[in-house]
């Protein structure tokens, strides 16, 4: 038999694929919820790609209350780098949407396109990874500013030593544990 070629689908995964067949037990409402969530993730990815390109090109946006415009304009204004991987080990790394470290001030900003309220925890981990990778003591920073841009609002947080040091300690501990386990 000569099978049909679907070149446009190679490397893609169907929203309701055979390998993730739990959808067989979905009612109509759940199926639509799952599909809409998948579409929102695709949209979020495209918005992140657009924001990165816009920031990298330095294309300021109109001053509006739209989250995306504020995120882009702030990143350009602070001369932030986009999509920076912060690496401690093969077990612990992550990609910060935008980041800058200048004059002993660390800024990490994150764009969230979902409807559910985002947690600052992810950005706290980025701070810990930054400190570990660049061998900077958090207590020595003049300031650390974290921002989440979501739903036409901005949440800003200035973490404390008491928040960051336990995360650093946990990363170091778990990395040693995982490395030792791998060597056995």
Residue ranges and their predicted role:
Residues 84-177:
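Mg2+/Mn2+-dependent nuclease catalytic core
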Residues 12, 19, 144, 149, ...:
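Low-complexity, intrinsically disordered/propeptide-like segments
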Residues 176-184:
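Accessory terminal regions of nucleic-acid processing enzymes
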Residues 1-95:
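Metal-dependent nuclease catalytic cores that hydrolyze phosphodiester bonds in DNA/RNA
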